Every structure is written in structure tokens, then in C-alpha cells.
């Protein structure tokens, strides 16, 4: 994450999407939320934001995916990010945002959070508000649990709501093949289904942890840079409820593993399915096989850096 004051009229910032290689969800809290423990990995699918000074706050979308159903009003997360930065710094102007989206929408990969992260960085540079890294991370946490990680990038452990970050060592590059669904899944619906599942099976499963933790095997696999080790410990507590709400994802998981994936996992709350491949050649072969099965497929590598200024 890099930021500096500028005299440019336009600032271009970029932030990555993410995969949760491990996601453990704690018990339902009184406020209706859950604490989590997750291992994030930033992957090379990017959201690009161009920020231009303006009197008010506005946003428009473009890019490789259909954005026609996205809101461009005050409730858009990128607009909220810009307004939050202006309010917290006393900046009296506005901004027009142009966002090119390449991270699947409502796919569990943090595309909206990447928009917000890139917007914070772009506006901080455009306006010369000169927030520190920690200040930007704190603002990001006000916007959503995944925003701080989109700012930080790399590989990290997220606790609390996922916004309290600790860097994690990760050696080498992991090869991912992403099967993109033609539909979205509501994150609140997936968490709600998880709570119902736990209530229905309270006699048969261990109680949810009050303070969830990432399994040590995940950290060891990341440190080793070994995709075979990581494949053995991929974990997502939200996968079962996501499969319940979207049963077709189970067929996608099976298809990927039948065509050479080391393992597959629903990314976050879904419905994107992330397959881990042994190496680049295996990833290419898997991409071809899934494409032949008429799935929309993207290949990506991780970890990659977090939000940064491209020009400005």
C-alpha cells in the first residue's frame, strides 16, 4: 500500500481480489455478527479505480464483467469510502470515480472491498490528505471486514470480523483456477444458513468456537509454499451452507477435482469456486477442461501486493 500527495488531476489506483484459503466462523454473537479466523491470500485479479476531483461524489463502472446491476448511488461502497475519507480529514471537495471491475461480483472474492481500498488510496493521493498506513487501515475497517486486507495484500491472518490483520509468511506462488458462477449469493444468507445448520445439528457437531483460530497446518503449508500441503488443509465453514443454497456448486467442485485440481474450495461466502493446482501446467490444463465443460473460468496466482498507486 503506497500513497503520496499529487498535483495530478487524475489518480489511478489498483487493488486485488482475495481467496480465503481457510475460514473458521465462530459462534453467533449477541450483535448478530460472528467472529472469524481466516487466512487471506490476495490474487492477481484487480479492480482499477480512476479518481478525478469533482464538486460531488459519483461513480461509473466498466471492465470485463457485467456491472449493469451495481448501484451507483450513495450506498455504493467506493462512494462511501470516498465520503468517509473526506469527512475524517475535513476535505471539502468531492470526487468522480471510474472503476474497471475484474473481480467477480458477489462471488466471495472481495471485489467491492477492493474498490473501497483502491478508492481510499486514490482519494488520499488526489486530495493530498496524507493519511498513514494505519489510518487508512482503520478507515477500511469501518467500511467492511475485507477492506483492510485489500489495502494490505499478500497473505495475512484476519481475526475479529476479519479486519484485524497479522501478516503471514508465504513462500513462492500458488496457482489458482477460479470457476465463476453466473449468479451471486448473499453473504448474510450464507451466514444465516450456517446458524440454522448449527442449530439443527447441535447434538451431533462440536459447538462453534467463541474465539476461532486458523489451523496451524494452514500456516505451515503457506510457509513451505507447498500446494500439496495446502490442498490438504483448505477449509471453509461457509462452504456447506453455500452448497445448501446453491447445490450446483457441488457438481463444480467434483468436476474440478476429477480434472486434476489438488483441491477445491468455495471462496468466502461463494459462489466462486477456487481450485488449487500443482503448478502452472496443471492450472492451464484444468482451465481448458473446465472451459470445455462450459464453465466461466479465470486463472490467477497469489499472493500479490495490496492496493497501490499506478499513476498520479
Swiss-Prot record:
Entry's Gene Ontology BP terms: isopentenyl diphosphate biosynthetic process, methylerythritol 4-phosphate pathway; terpenoid biosynthetic process
Pathway in which the depicted protein is active: Isoprenoid biosynthesis; isopentenyl diphosphate biosynthesis via DXP pathway; isopentenyl diphosphate from 1-deoxy-D-xylulose 5-phosphate: step 3/6
Enzyme class, UniProt record, top EC level: transferase
Binding of ATP, residues: 104-114
The EC number(s) this enzyme carries: 2.7.1.148
Catalytic residues in the record: 18, 146
Catalytic activity: 4-CDP-2-C-methyl-D-erythritol + ATP = 4-CDP-2-C-methyl-D-erythritol 2-phosphate + ADP + H(+)
This protein's record includes keyword RNA-binding: no
Keyword field: ATP-binding, Isoprene biosynthesis, Kinase, Nucleotide-binding, Transferase
A GO term, aspect molecular function: 4-(cytidine 5'-diphospho)-2-C-methyl-D-erythritol kinase activity
Organism domain of life: Bacteria
InterPro entries: GHMP_kinase_C_dom (IPR013750), GHMP_kinase_C_sf (IPR036554), GHMP_kinase_N_dom (IPR006204), IspE (IPR004424), Ribosomal_Su5_D2-typ_SF (IPR020568), Ribsml_uS5_D2-typ_fold_subgr (IPR014721)
Coiled-coil zones: none
Pfam families reported in the protein's UniProt record: GHMP_kinases_C (PF08544), GHMP_kinases_N (PF00288)
Family of this protein: Belongs to the GHMP kinase family. IspE subfamily.
Known role: Catalyzes the phosphorylation of the position 2 hydroxy group of 4-diphosphocytidyl-2C-methyl-D-erythritol.
Protein name (record): 4-diphosphocytidyl-2-C-methyl-D-erythritol kinase
Species whose genome carries this gene: Clavibacter michiganensis subsp. michiganensis (strain NCPPB 382)
